[in-house]
C-alpha cells in the first residue's frame, strides 16, 4: 500500500482508540453521576424537587420530634411535613408545635401565659429533631415585638431562646440529628385585602427577615443545618396563583406546601449528615 494509505490507516486507528477512550471516560463519568444523583420528583403543586432518601442515612431514623408554631403544627393543612416524613421513613412522630408559639419565653395575651418553642425544646425527644419557626416573636404583643438580642442564654430574646433551645435539645438527645427551618415569607389575606406583609416593621423597627437572618447566622454558630424557607424560591405568598395552590391564607402552607417542605428538609439532612 502507498504511504498515504498507511498514514490514513494509522489516523483511523488513532481516532478509533481516542473514541474508545472517550467512551470509557464518559461511562465512568455517568457512573459517578448515577452514584451522586438523586431521584427527581414533581410534587402535587407542580414543584420539581429532588428526593435524597435512597442516598441518605435518614433512612435509619426511627423517631422524629418536631417543635415550632402553627406552620409545623399543620394549621390549614390536611397533613403536615412531620407526618409526611414519618410515613416516608416509617418512623414514629411526635409533634409538640403550637399555634402562636414564640421562640422567647415571654408572656402572651391578656392572661400572660407563656407559649414558647424553648419550652417545647425541653420536652422533645427523637432520633431526628426538627425546629421550625417562628414569626411570632416579630408579631408579639400586637407587634410590640421581642428583641432579637445578642446573648446566647437570654431566654427573653429571640436569639438567646433559639440558641438555648438547640443546646437543650443536644443535652437531652445527644445522638439526635437536628434540622432547623425558618419562617417563610407571608402575605396574610382577608379576601382581596392584604392584612400585613413580612416586610412590615414592628415597634422595634424589625421586619420578619431580621429575625430569620439572626436565626440563620445562629445556625452556623451552633453547627446545625437550616432550611431557610424565607429566602427560598418555593414559597411565593405574594403570587395569587401560589396562594391558591399551596398557601390559601397567605400564611400557612397547605398539604401541598408541606410536601415541598418535607423534601427540602430531606435535602438539608442529606447535605449535612449524609
Protein language model annotation of sequence segments:
Residues 162-166, 212:
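Generic structural signal for well-ordered alpha-helices
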Residues 183-274:
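Catalytic His-Asp segment of secreted/periplasmic serine-dependent ester chemistry enzymes
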Residues 85-86, 169, 218-219:
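A generic structural signal for well-ordered alpha-helical segments
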Residues 132, 179-181:
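Conserved, well-ordered alpha-helix/loop/beta-strand core segments that scaffold catalytic motifs
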Residues 1-67, 71-77, 87-88, 123-124, ...:
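N-terminal secretory targeting modules
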Residues 61-66, 71-160:
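Conserved SGNH/GDSL esterase-like catalytic core that processes O-acyl groups on lipids
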Residues 173-177:
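A short helix->loop->beta-strand "cap" motif at the edges of active sites that frequently abuts
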